[in-house]
Amino acid sequence: MRVIIVIMMVVFVVVGTSSGQEIILTSEKLINSAYQLQEIHEKVGIQSDIVTVEQIWDSYSPVEDPLVSGYSTEQVYDSYNYTLALKIISFLRTVNASYVTILGDADIVPPSYYAKLIFYEPFPTDFFYASPDYDLKPDFAVGRIPAGSEDEAEKVLGKINDWLSDIGSGNYVNAALIGMRIYAAPYSIERETIDDYEVWQGETAVKLLEDLGFTETFNTTIALQSDEEWTSVKQTFDEALSGGYGVVFHVGHGIPYALDSDDGGMYTTRYMNMLDKRRPLLPVVLSSGCSAAAFDEEIRDIYLPNWAPGLWSEFLLTNDAGGIAFVGFTGTTGSDYQFSESDGFVEVAGVKHADNILIKTLKNLPGNRLGDAFKAALEEVKSEENIKLNPSTEVEEWKLRVYLEAETKFLET
């Protein structure tokens, strides 16, 4: 499971609760949309400066490579402009800001790096734009709006304006929690499992949110795979992605164009393409599904069937229905749940890795911008799980991989 956070500068519950300087990082190809985005953000209290990759290319030199194993050369990905990525990092080392919003897909603004850690599968990460000094502590809240053209950007801008108008509906208090049955974490330190093959990890995540008081704060709809009703899971997705919800939380398998919906069934972008927005307010969607936050089909050959209208995280934002933001992972990811026994009952004692990032983001979200909530979650996980830049064991390498995979895609911070 890889985490990608799509940040649209989402203001949750309280619009404009804080103000901060923002860099809108884009290209001359999308400059008109960038000016419109700047105007929208300034209306909610964020003063923005627009900087283009063309300006950065002419004015900055590339910095040193990140100290992480990876596919860092253009010989690996002919379409990956690694030199531009290093120049962007060089520019960001000079910036005094709170937010960086990337307006553009991977072809327009390249990922900050392609890391190659455990499993040896390369995955894109924007994390080194958030931490340009490479110390693994995010200096900025970074989110990407993966628009590839002015037409796509215009559609996204329309969704942002609608979302800001809809926030007064009060529907942000509605949440959908979807828990699926998935495999045990491959690098679980204690290898805690309920049986020899898999755990009810999605349901465990929902139970943990209940223990943390989430269901007391939100009006929650819960769909669990143990009900053995795939239609209830699919119907929950259909309902929430048609509007009227503030949050959708999903723990299950993922692929670049779909999320886990039942044994062998996936909720694909084709299903989402059939939806219309029917109620005010589209949700912030969080999922630990593997590769659901992939955003680099312009660079990598990501398999998409001919009937799939696009990558999950991108289509979620550019479709009329869907969501206003996505927090997820760009590649293979996983979580590790700990359990304890008390008086004959099994309790959830804690969680690590992917779901830990998502749950901490949710905990920090009420009253804060999504970018701030995600940044705070990363800081907490880095400290709590002791994420290291130079891992010496497979477990440490796995922790670093999941941490770097986390990504935010959003329309509004």
Curated annotation (Swiss-Prot):
Bilayer-crossing regions: none
Single GO term (MF): cysteine-type peptidase activity
GO BP of this protein: proteolysis
Signal peptide range in chain numbering: 1-20
SUPFAM superfamilies attached to this UniProt entry: Caspase-like
Keywords: Signal
Taxonomic superkingdom: Archaea
Pfam families xref list: Peptidase_C25 (PF01364)
Protein name: Uncharacterized protein AF_0048
Species in which this protein is naturally found: Archaeoglobus fulgidus (strain ATCC 49558 / DSM 4304 / JCM 9628 / NBRC 100126 / VC-16)
